Amino acid sequence: MNIDDKLEGLFLKCGGIDEMQSSRAMVVMGGVSGQSAVSGELQESVLQDRSLPHQEILAADEVLQESEMRQQDMISHDELMVHEETVKNDEEQTDTHERLPQGLQYALNVPISVKQEITFTDVSEQLMRDKKQVREPVDLQKKKKRKQRSPAKILTINEDGSLGLKTPKSHVCEHCNAAFRTNYHLQRHVFIHTGEKPFQCSQCDMRFIQKYLLQRHEKIHTGEKPFRCDECGMRFIQKYHMERHKRTHSGEKPYQCEYCLQYFSRTDRVLKHKRMCHENHDKKLNRCAIKGGLLTSEEDSGFSTSPKDNSLPKKKRQKPEKKSSGMDKESVLDKSDTKKDRNDYLPLYSSSTKVKDEYMVAEYAVEMPHSSVGGSHLEDASGEIHPPKLVLKKINSKRSLKQPLEQSQTISPLSTYEDSKVSKYAFELVDKQALLDSEGSADIDQVDNLQEGPSKPVHSSTNYDDAMQFLKKKRYLQAASNNSREYALNVGTIASQPSVTQAAVASVIDENTTASILDSQALNVEIKSNHDKNVIPDEVLQTLLDHYSHKANGQHEISFSVADTEVTSSISINSSDVPEVTQSENVGSSSQASSSDKANMLQEYSKFLQQALDRTSQNDAYLNSPSLNFVTDNQTLPNPPAFSSIDKQVYAAMPINSFRSGMNSPLRTTPDKSHFGLIVGDSQHPFPFSGDETNHASATSTADFLDQVTSQKKAEAQPVHQAYQMSSFEQPFRAPYHGSRAGIATQFSTANGQVNLRGPGTSAEFSEFPLVNVNDNRAGMTSSPDATTGQTFG
């Protein structure tokens, strides 16, 4: 070893550039290991300048010699080197001894000054060698003790002759056969299998495997965030989080997908991208190829799936597929993908993608199989493929409605294109209005939106129909008592226009009945909220329904079945739909309408039910006259509003005089009691007429009113109205009556038992007769809908 070092120093110091390169080549071949080549390069870089001082050359030479000895000691005392290395070293040493004379010839040609330098160098080197040899035994013993452990890195020679560093992992986990460098790493890994977490947090009792994880977790409790972003000032517990956050400011994307070369700013996004885009795609291709191989083998053997196999559960059907395809680990990873497969032997349709709110997007992407897989069948049936359009349909989550898919006996590329799948995905597209109506919007004033809507899907649930019937019944029975809905007729803020009269509708719409229109001219109402007394009992409504459904006179053309009638209790005011009428039909409407409340609608609803009860009574004289028809009155309403959303029915007008709410329901609880035109109820609050009402043009005496009422009672075949003493309308109240109602021509007419009341109610002193003066022109229940053939009252 000493001879080699001396020769190396000699050739480097005395020779020229060419000699230095040749000596460097000799050192590479004759060195003990390839590390000597590295040392030769270092010597060349250090000693390339010929004018270096003598002491610097000696110091550099000493450093190189120490590094060589250290490397040689490590290699000699480690018995993990390959045997070829030692054989190669012996051969290289013999080659260096053969080439020594050539090297000495070059060294003899140097000048005298250089020779003196060489001899001086040899003496100094010898002194340094002697000192190191004295210390060598102690250093070797220490190094031997240290190297008895497993070395961190081992120098090895690769197959191509290059050097490599190998890290031995001698500590192997007995659970999963994972190897580790040290026992510490192994014990830390074993905690994962055993579940042991020795480090516990003192504040939240969380446990951790490593201590640094506990220390990092404790910063959450203390609120310490030592790492701060320079640009935005955000602070972080971990330095990694801060560095990741800084990439949002700089826009740096250091991570790249190895498949599509797309860059990402975070590693988790790269992994997610690979998992979603590339790994699943590769797995699908592998699965498709395996299924294609299965199909060819089954076609060659003439195998066809039996219906018994189709009736098996999905997991049991997948087991023989896994065994036959030989997918051991990939089948476990593909569980999420195989759940979407429906025994499809060919990938004709890609799996349907699930979107939010359980909407299914049906993707019909027909993939062409291989040429060896049923090519003749595909050519024959390719002209018949008509994939349905992409539609959005809210699917039903019930598994009981999913019909089992029946496979065809002869397996072909189009065996999975079945009628059941087509019916599952292909539905009619509904328009926006029908969608809004079908979603249960109670505030849309439509009459027959369910009857006019699109047909129901094939796999619709029957619970939806039950729910809709229940909603109809609840809306019919509780329309008057539901406090959550707002029935405020905000008419007081609307000024009366000269050609358009604002109207509010609070009515129950039926196929054969009319609605009641509130005249805004007469809505000078003072409302007192008394919700406890304004609720119509359910018994009363049920009695009415029973009465309408089971009439004794055999006239069943009027159906009040809850299941067949849709009740809309919303209020719509649309002044743009109100047509203009002539000036002769206008009545002076100078007073502004005041605001009303829910009680207003309740009372109108009660009055409408009472009038409907009068019309459908079995002894009522109105049912015996076939000439009655829907009645319109063009003299009382300046411009009758046309509500386009309520089936274009003709409405009877009902002027409302001033009254106060708070009355109980004026309906009778049983249908066999008497019904009368003036709604008389047992109310605790009278409805006095205010004396400051607008004076009108003409008035009708009370005597005319009494004559017409008595003539009506005589005209009836079987009178069902109770006889009330109407003499109270005589002289004591005639004068204030004429003074207060002089503006409107109050008209009373009788025709076939109907009374058109356009007169006022009682005065303030009659508390025993709380007359609600809202009787409209009753619509006749006849079969002819033509209004011109009927009788017009007024």
UniProtKB/Swiss-Prot annotation:
Biased composition (Basic and acidic residues): 321-344
Keyword field contains Transcription: yes
Keyword Lipoprotein on entry: no
Region (Disordered): 298-346, 574-596
MF-aspect GO terms: DNA-binding transcription factor activity; DNA-binding transcription repressor activity, RNA polymerase II-specific; double-stranded DNA binding; RNA polymerase II cis-regulatory region sequence-specific DNA binding; sequence-specific DNA binding; transcription cis-regulatory region binding; zinc ion binding
Alphabetized PROSITE patterns for the sequence: ZINC_FINGER_C2H2_1, ZINC_FINGER_C2H2_2
Entry keyword set: Acetylation, DNA-binding, Isopeptide bond, Metal-binding, Nucleus, Phosphoprotein, Repeat, Repressor, Transcription, Transcription regulation, Ubl conjugation, Zinc, Zinc-finger
InterPro entries in the record: Znf_C2H2_sf, Znf_C2H2_type
Residues joined by cross-link Glycyl lysine isopeptide (Lys-Gly) (interchain with G-Cter in SUMO2): 6, 88, 115, 132, 291, 308, 356, 402, 421, 424
Residues modified as Phosphoserine: 51, 250, 301, 306, 412, 665, 784
Compositional bias ranges of the Polar residues kind: 574-588
Tissue distribution: Expressed in heart, lung, kidney, skeletal muscle, liver, brain and spleen.
Post-translational modification: Sumoylated with SUMO2. Desumoylated by SENP3, resulting in the stimulation of transcription of its target genes.
N6-acetyllysine carried by residues: 607
Gene3D superfamilies with a match to the protein in the record: Classic Zinc Finger
PANTHER family xrefs: EARLY GROWTH RESPONSE 4-RELATED, KRUEPPEL-LIKE TRANSCRIPTION FACTOR
Assembly and interaction partners: Interacts with HNRNPDL. Interacts with the 5FMC complex; the interaction requires association with CHTOP. Interacts with CAVIN1.
Name of this protein: Zinc finger protein 148
Source organism of the structure: Rattus norvegicus (Rat)
